[in-house]
């Protein structure tokens, strides 16, 4: 997983100053499992941070982090994790117009991947 993170960040960094219809200046979050579970925060400047618990990215991440820090705990149930994800993105959507207006939550396990929730939020003034 670490080598995949290194490869991805090298590709992103090498495209920072090149014109492309495919955005090269992006922020990636990469998770995976080999001998253990790993979560990486990859920046367009080529830096990589391995995180132990949770990570948020984007313009609304400041609001999302408040919820993540309040609700995250080791050994959460799947339902608690999905609820926390929805609450954190919802906090960002309510306070940051660039975050968007919906969320799709997927749960990834050894058995595969499944869609756990899909929610649209009305952020327009009525």
Predicted regions and their residues:
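Long, low-complexity N-terminal extensions
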Residues: 1-126
